[in-house]
Amino acid sequence: MKQSITALCIFSIASWFCNTVSGQSASGYHIAKTFHIASPGGWDYPAADAGSNKLYLSHGTQVNILDKETGDSVGVISNTTGVHGIAFVHSLGKGYTSNGRLNNVTVFDLASGNVLKQIATGKNPDWVFYEPFSKKIITSNHSGGDLSVIDPASDEVVATIPVIGNAVETIMSDNAGKIFVSAEDKSEIVVVDITKLAVTDHWPLSPGEGPTGLAIDVETKRLFSGCDKLLIVMDATNGKIIDKLPIGDGCDGVAFDPETKMVFTANGEGTMTVIKEVSANEFKVIDNVPTKRGARTITIDEKTHTLFLPTGDYEPLPANAPKGTRPKIVPGSFQVLVLKK
């Protein structure tokens, strides 16, 4: 996710030039407000609950729950060390967090935020996802190279699906029996038959490398894979690459708005790339919205079309710091950027 100022400027100018020459207008998205959370710790995926006015934030050893409109704290879920993501099962009134350093999932009550149970999973569960076709909770176990399948009715692991690779990331579903897994170390999409609980295909993403964030348009059957400075658009029926589009550096999250047909990539360099799905086979980069360094993950509130990107402030590096040194996060600077039109 390293990016020099010079390279960032070139990328931004080039994007502006291309948009101007082609007559494309800017997306209109901008940072409308910033929610500040004083507690320490890093961050990963946020989750906007479509069934309530709550925003859930993976934050070090806990999950912060905020009011989506005001940013006010409405709860905290503790003992989720290394938390990566949050998923919801509204029909059962339950939520699930993937706790990477604890190798488990926390089950909590959506209404109260109270913890109901912890479920052991594979090693370092990363993405956690409610799959609507099978009605199961699935975790991608980043260090274990497999998926844990949980029945939310019993809150028990009912299957483990081996996936080749040791860096499995985001999972998406076609809502018809197939799920798609980003394999970061293999630079491919792994296809799983969720009924048979078995891998059926491996689809290479080349020239895309290091895929992390993933989104899907279930209507047009298009997958959107956030790779190293590229968004790869893939046919979800056969793995054919439809398009490849330039995005900012350090993407770790992709969101899709099914109503506006917009794809958003959160880029750790400090931009959000906005791409329009004109049709199933035509895509255009229309904007690179300034955000903040470190804002690499994203979630969307599909009702309001609001986007949420967590980040923090960074301490300046010493002049003699070795190349590749990562800056430290300023303690207590955790925040969420709220982007609207």
Go through each PLM region and give its residues.
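Bacterial Sec-dependent N-terminal signal peptides
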Residues: 1-27
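Predominantly soluble domains enriched in secretory-pathway, periplasmic, or organellar proteins
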Residues: 19-341
